[in-house]
Regions:
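Short, low-complexity N-terminal intrinsically disordered segments enriched in polar/charged residues
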Residues: 10, 17-66
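Extended interaction regions within the primary functional domain
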Residues: 1, 17, 79, 134-136
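Juxtamembrane low-complexity tails/linkers enriched in Ser/Thr-Pro and polybasic
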Residues: 3-15
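Exposed beta-sheet edge and beta->alpha loop/turn motif
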Residues: 114-157
């Protein structure tokens, strides 16, 4: 005995419902794709930025590194976002420096600076990766500035 497959016939109402469900799923998928794209960070060269000046960002990075080297944390406070003000102090910097090396020696020079603009969720961030030479060690700084040119993120390696 062979079973014959019979094609189920849909009523016009069932066809409309099926088409409506397909359209709803398609709209949800498109919306999810757009939201995912919007949340992903978009990177581009800082020179192409419409928000930041590459020269201003590099000058601000040099200024901050200079203040850190001079241990002028009072002047540094006006250059960082409020959330960073508590942690940008001598005690925390000494802890961070000790993790890298006990004896950095004197600052010699900034060797390289690489920059980018990062756009995520509509916010623009200027990021700078700085290689600085000290007498006894090479240090890598990562600085990120918000649109007001305030230091929003900082790291040393």
């Amino acid at each position: 005995m062979s079973k014959k497959k019979t094609k189920k016939v849909l009523t016009p109402e069932q066809k409309k419902k099926r088409i409506r469900n397909i359209i709803i799923v398609a709209v949800i998928l498109v919306a999810a794709s757009v939201a995912t794209y919007w949340m992903q960070p978009q990177n581009k060269a800082l020179a192409e930025s419409e928000v930041f000046s590459e020269e201003e960002v590099k000058a601000q990075a040099e200024k901050i590194i200079g203040l850190l080297n001079a241990e002028d944390f009072d002047s540094l406070q006006s250059l960082v976002v409020p959330d960073m003000q508590e942690i940008m102090n001598k005690e925390r910097m000494d802890e961070g420096k000790a993790r890298i090396s006990e004896d950095w020696g004197d600052f010699v020079s900034i060797e390289t600076m690489q920059d980018a603009e990062i756009i995520q969720r509509g916010a623009h961030i200027a990021a700078v990766y700085v290689t600085a030479e000290y007498e006894n060690i090479e240090v890598h700084y990562t600085l990120a500035f918000n649109e007001d040119m305030k230091l929003a993120s900082f790291g040393i390696q």
